[in-house]
């Protein structure tokens, strides 16, 4: 279970530390992907494999939408390992997607992490603060 908010600086080689309390959950690997909200999603490899296996087992008709969904899921996925210092290298394409230049925020979101640029996270936090009650009132149980 991932929770909390952690601010880090990206180094000159594009590396960032994963919060120490989460590193053991990424012992088998970490998969980074473009998040739909302009962030980077980070999944433990076993969780990613489970989700993609479920996706691939669906009776999907090979139509335009299903091909696009496959592209979204797989074309921007990067399978990485933490180095000895608990860091990962953020691929340039994902840094660009998330507009990450120097300071970033790693947030825990239940079963995965999100990696945001500091600026984008501040904007997201402002929206969350403004819409908190509407979000809770319209929330459906999480499966």
Region locations from a protein language model:
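Flexible "stalk/tail and boundary" regions
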Residues: 1-8, 12, 22-80, 84-85, ...
